[in-house]
Amino acid sequence: MKLTKILIASTAMAAVAGMANAEAHMANDMTIVSWGGAYQASQIGAYSDPYLADHPGLSIVYDESSAEAVAKLRAMNEAGNITWDLVDVEAADAIRLCDEGLALEIDADEVLAAAPDGTSATDDFGDMLVSDCFIPQIVFSTTFGYRTDQVPAGVEPPDSACDVFDLETYPGKRALNKRPIANMEWALLCDGVAYEDVYDLLETDEGQARAFAKLDTIKDQTVWWSAAAETPQLLADGEIFMGSTYNGRLFSVIAEQNQPVGMAWDWQMLDLDGWIIPAGLPEDRLARVLDYVMFATDTQRLADQAQFISYGPARASSAPLVGKHAELGIDMGPHMPTDPANGANKFVNNYAWWADYRDDLDAKFQAWLAQ
């Protein structure tokens, strides 16, 4: 018995010493790049606060530059000075960064925790692993919110992305993202193009011209946003009637802020968001990031994030653990973009297509905006 206690104590001391030794070789500060607003707050609540509780000597700084991540990482790489440690990006940007060698390739089963039942990370994330550099977190959608108190009398509220183009039925200012993704698809879909033909058509000059012509019909009534928090604020202030943003942002303004805002789910664009690790980090910074990522993407942590925002967890094992909102106590399941009741029509961001065409269409879109 005495020997057993000694062995157990020795083993425990060795484990503690091992953890301390590993911690000693990790950086004591970390810069995480995200999107700000309700989404970043959900990451802090589900990932960073619990991680910091276990690592009191660590300092985490958030940089709200995810929208410019590709351009800024290119510039950092050119200058040979990578100041970011972990970057939250959409899947299409992760593919581009990976293709350009600006993001670290990972082995998911080495870097990410297995599910509680032993299912490998590769199997648990499944099709969400769209790039060798991408570490999935959430499924979200880009959809539309509208002011319920500005719906004309006797008119049904908008329920589709296509209603944004109907200025006659729904007069008032719009808000759209200042980039081509989703806007180009909506323009063609709402101009009568079948979804299965959208991307083939967008590869042609004629298809692009048709999309821009459709967007021209609302251009002078549109506020163009670059930060996802802008549309919820414009809606809350009553400065627009209808605008696009991420579904979690709309959930926040509706459920948490009690603003007179509704959601039009039909033709929402489903998307993936997650982490990339910049290539070329020093060993101590990389060790810290890998430790944080394994913690922040485990089954429980991804389920915990859904307590703060209505984005679906990217792990299959996390979905059954999604429960009620941390403060409001409401069931979060019906507020997820993947709920079958939320829109008869939806489409998934064509990540590979946008990775190939993004730079070209970005330039054309900005030139069109400047006209």
Give, region by region, the residue ranges found by the protein language model.
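A ligand-binding cleft/hinge motif common to bilobed small-molecule-binding domains
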Residues: 93-96, 242-260
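Gram-negative bacterial Sec-dependent N-terminal signal peptides
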Residues: 1-22
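Mature extracytoplasmic/periplasmic domains
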Residues: 278-345
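A bilobed periplasmic-binding-protein/Venus flytrap-type ligand-binding module shared by bacterial periplasmic
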Residues: 145-150, 188-189, 272-285, 304-307
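Early extracytoplasmic/lumenal segment of secretory-pathway proteins
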Residues: 24-96
